Curated annotation (Swiss-Prot):
In-chain residues carrying the UniProt-annotated modification Sulfotyrosine: Y73, Y75
Subcellular location per the Swiss-Prot or TrEMBL entry: Secreted
Propeptide residues per the UniProt entry: 21-72, 78-81
Protein name: Putative phytosulfokines 6
Superkingdom as given in the UniProt entry: Eukaryota
Stated role: Promotes plant cell differentiation, organogenesis and somatic embryogenesis as well as cell proliferation.
Signal peptide: 1-20
Keyword set includes Signal: yes
Expression sites by tissue: Expressed in roots, leaves, stems, flowers and siliques. Most abundant in vascular bundles and in root tips.
Upper lineage: Eukaryota, Viridiplantae, Streptophyta, Embryophyta, Tracheophyta
InterPro entries reported in the protein's UniProt record: Phytosulfokine
Amino acid sequence: MKQSLCLAVLFLILSTSSSAIRRGKEDQEINPLVSATSVEEDSVNKLMGMEYCGEGDEECLRRRMMTESHLDYIYTQHHKH
């Protein structure tokens, strides 16, 4: 009885660990397809109020330029005193 119980528990542990390993391998195949921009860089841009501008999007480029110049102004004013 004890031996069959131990074998059943061992079988369950091995089957769950092998399925978890298989799922991990599948996740690694998906990762290269994720966005090229790192999460950290993206969150910093959002924090600073800067957005990604597509090619030829003049309005977006103006907004980004104003945001960057405003941040530069704040930074230089802080260091003058």
